[in-house]
Amino acid sequence: MTTMPNWLKQRAFLTPERIAVSDGRRTKTFAELYEAAAVWARRLAQAGVKEGDIVALLMKNRIEMIEIIHALFFLGARVLLQNVRLTSYELGWQLDDSGARLAIADEELAGSLDGDGRVLTVGAVAALPEVDVSLKETCDLEEVATIMYTSGTTGTPKGVLQTYGNHWWSAVGSALNLGLHERDCWLAAVPLFHISGLSIAMRSVIYGMPMRLQTSFDPKEANEWIMRGDVTIMSVVAAMLQRMVAELGEARYPDTFRCMLLGGGPAPRPLLEACKEKGIPVYQTYGMTETASQIATLAPEYSLTKLGSAGKPLFPAELCILKDGKPAAPHEAGEIVVKGPNVTKGYWQRPEATAQAIRGGWFFTGDIGYLDEDGFLYVLDRRSDLIISGGENVYPAEVEAVLLSHPDVEEAGVTGVENETWGQVPYAFVRLKRGASPDEAALRAFCRERLAKYKVPARIYFVDELPRNAAQKLLRRELKRLIPKTEQTF
């Protein structure tokens, strides 16, 4: 067992008057954040939350979300972060699978969990009386702090276990790579329910660094904060960065802005060239929920000479490429395998999936890539067939499962198609049962009832057969060939 002082308690002790978080309207110091989190903890104890419980949060970015996360840490509870874009069915499934004791939701989101007796709105929790409770003063780095569900290539959602140690070493690795400056302030315009957003909140208390919080991404406001020198680091995906560059116009960021951390897949060359011309320091990254954020990062000086690369592994992580169980040669494609204290210990109540993913201390990502002769990582396929749409992961198997649940559908295949706005969008290919009539609008409506909006196929094509290999395995990479040539843009 390796313990250390509770991060927020220790930070409030070390630098109580330093700014912890601001949303442009409200600002809180670490001392104020600590006091607020303690109040939430005493209210949540009144609601019956105790050590070891799993408590779900369905909230958009706001200061109260950060306070409640730390409040649950004070009680020794595990925090299940839920994506606000999911459907009621998807959210309810996560609650049932995790065995969550309680779900806390923003007032406008509580309807997504309507009828579930475990749900309390943030306002309802705020109205609870406080009870005397002993707040945990330490954290065990081996204990699970947070859980985030990821569907994986099987389409079956799995809860990724993120320990305090995972978050700690992710923060340390990032600091050793990016450095830590006295005037640093990290802008969180990405959702806190994603690891990219949550990692900023964790780093804030570990570093003693203020964070700026956007409820939802606003490129104009983000640029204004950067131009004023209020922000020095920002996490984005390519679609966000494109909007910021367009909104920036002929202006240039001040020297106070030192890092644009770009995730969600390699950026298109024109965007990188525009950033280089404007002097925007872009750091491309590779990471996932299972690695508690970035595990490899490309420094800006290599952004064009190593175009498309995700860089090199961060301290103290390791990364290699395996082909047929052996180390691959430079430029030889194979599976990306990673190791380090920021890597998950496994999946919630999924021992078989955990054993398949973690072997000999190495995490097999399922992603395909290669290392060049200088050791720079290039990712070829994200989780084989993973679609990344606007920074959100869309797993074809999950969408296919919904399509196959329709009584008229015999077969279904889903793949990603390039899109200027979102990077990729899902396209579906369906073979109907005999006698059924094709109705794209009705089938998309069926999907909208069961899937988050970004997972709903942008187009559905009706075909006579789907491409399969000799073993009858669906060849998703061949699906785009089924798009009529008059509609192809690739």
Curated annotation (Swiss-Prot):
<dbReference type="InterPro" id="IPR010192">
    <property type="entry name" value="MenE"/>
</dbReference>
<dbReference type="GO" id="GO:0009234">
    <property type="term" value="P:menaquinone biosynthetic process"/>
</dbReference>
<comment type="pathway">
    <text>Quinol/quinone metabolism; 1,4-dihydroxy-2-naphthoate biosynthesis; 1,4-dihydroxy-2-naphthoate from chorismate: step 5/7.</text>
</comment>
<dbReference type="Pfam" id="PF00501">
    <property type="entry name" value="AMP-binding"/>
</dbReference>
<dbReference type="InterPro" id="IPR025110">
    <property type="entry name" value="AMP-bd_C"/>
</dbReference>
<keyword id="KW-0067">ATP-binding</keyword>
<protein>
    <recommendedName>
        <fullName>2-succinylbenzoate--CoA ligase</fullName>
        <ecNumber>6.2.1.26</ecNumber>
    </recommendedName>
</protein>
<dbReference type="GO" id="GO:0005524">
    <property type="term" value="F:ATP binding"/>
</dbReference>
<dbReference type="InterPro" id="IPR042099">
    <property type="entry name" value="ANL_N_sf"/>
</dbReference>
<dbReference type="InterPro" id="IPR020845">
    <property type="entry name" value="AMP-binding_CS"/>
</dbReference>
<comment type="similarity">
    <text>Belongs to the ATP-dependent AMP-binding enzyme family. MenE subfamily.</text>
</comment>
<keyword id="KW-0547">Nucleotide-binding</keyword>
<keyword id="KW-0474">Menaquinone biosynthesis</keyword>
<dbReference type="InterPro" id="IPR045851">
    <property type="entry name" value="AMP-bd_C_sf"/>
</dbReference>
<dbReference type="InterPro" id="IPR000873">
    <property type="entry name" value="AMP-dep_synth/lig_dom"/>
</dbReference>
<keyword id="KW-0436">Ligase</keyword>
<dbReference type="InterPro" id="IPR050237">
    <property type="entry name" value="ATP-dep_AMP-bd_enzyme"/>
</dbReference>
<dbReference type="Pfam" id="PF13193">
    <property type="entry name" value="AMP-binding_C"/>
</dbReference>
<comment type="function">
    <text>Converts 2-succinylbenzoate (OSB) to 2-succinylbenzoyl-CoA (OSB-CoA).</text>
</comment>
<comment type="pathway">
    <text>Quinol/quinone metabolism; menaquinone biosynthesis.</text>
</comment>
<dbReference type="GO" id="GO:0008756">
    <property type="term" value="F:o-succinylbenzoate-CoA ligase activity"/>
</dbReference>
